[in-house]
């Protein structure tokens, strides 16, 4: 369900400076609440990022990362873990070539170089790591392992997998150290937790293999609590959040659906898993361009940019507003598709309307239909307690910042030049 941009991201990291990454200031504190930027939800997080306006992020090549004054850049850490119990001390035949820690040498340099590259950008960018390791580690360890609830009921109960998993998480956090970074823990996993049952009763290996979390319950809830607590211990200036999957709402066309109730249920689950002590919660609109889904998979995933019919952006923002207010943490859009009306609906050039809905512009309504001009919706995002939007391709053949005709870069430059939209209005 996820695209792991291992090769592309690794090459980008190799182009970054090798100087040490630095930190700026203190961690925002639990819950992402109010700060000097105002009394609105999320202002403390933006304070920590050095801004008061909604941020724009990107994932892509080193060229894309510097094509506009982006506020943050993100990258996946994925592909599976080292085969030994603890992180490799040297990269070679004895260490899995798919482990992120050996995309550069010595082990861990990949993350350091990524942070350094973000810090040396002009203007300076905040690095964001999407930690997505359970699925591919389980696939490499358990014969026939399939994505889904087995990640919860099988992988998270496997002592061997979880020993390596926590050791790798600790290694990443120690690599970040005092630096400022955003940490996004396991997209999709928490959605599968919801499908599997109650996280406070679903078993997971926690303290039995992790000395940092001996006081945590041996449940999925304890696993999430443990990972966030480890951030506070080893990377105190990092900001962290789980992901909220709006799978019941993303394609909803029934106006009678209680969107707020669904969001509240997700919030309750995530809070039990430690989100109540996190800084932000991650949300997404889709993992692929709508044009791709329509042409290649014969699926209609278009959202109405006029918000007149369902599914719509307004419906999603209603869900996010209820989610953030129930959690007490702001949201961050992540991995937002880059397709636009000028694309030709072939590989790497699929249409979508996400960029143009958020920034304003000529937005595609369907794959073959005429585009409609819409105004920007940054104020609507602020009203839903959204910190900003990070754009990036969700698969190798999707529209990305290098193939979108410069649409994202041009709109980001105009947005940043205008001073952006204040979160606290």
Could you tell me what each predicted segment is?
Residues 1-39:
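Ser/Thr-rich, Pro/Gly/Ala-heavy low-complexity intrinsically disordered linkers and tails
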Residues 37-92, 389:
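Boundary/entry segment of secreted carbohydrate-active catalytic domains
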Residues 54-55, 59-61, 126-127, 280-292, ...:
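Substrate-binding cleft of secreted/luminal carbohydrate-active enzymes
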Residues 63-69, 112-124, 174-178, 232-235, ...:
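Acidic (Asp/Glu)-rich catalytic clusters
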Residues 68-81, 262-306:
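Aromatic- and acid-rich polysaccharide-binding/catalytic face
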Residues 82-237:
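Substrate-binding cleft of extracellular glycoside hydrolase catalytic domains
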Residues 184-186, 212-260, 283, 327-341:
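Aromatic-lined carbohydrate-recognition surfaces of secreted/lumenal glycan-active proteins
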Residues 248-277, 343-350:
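Substrate-binding cleft/loops of secretory-pathway carbohydrate-active enzymes
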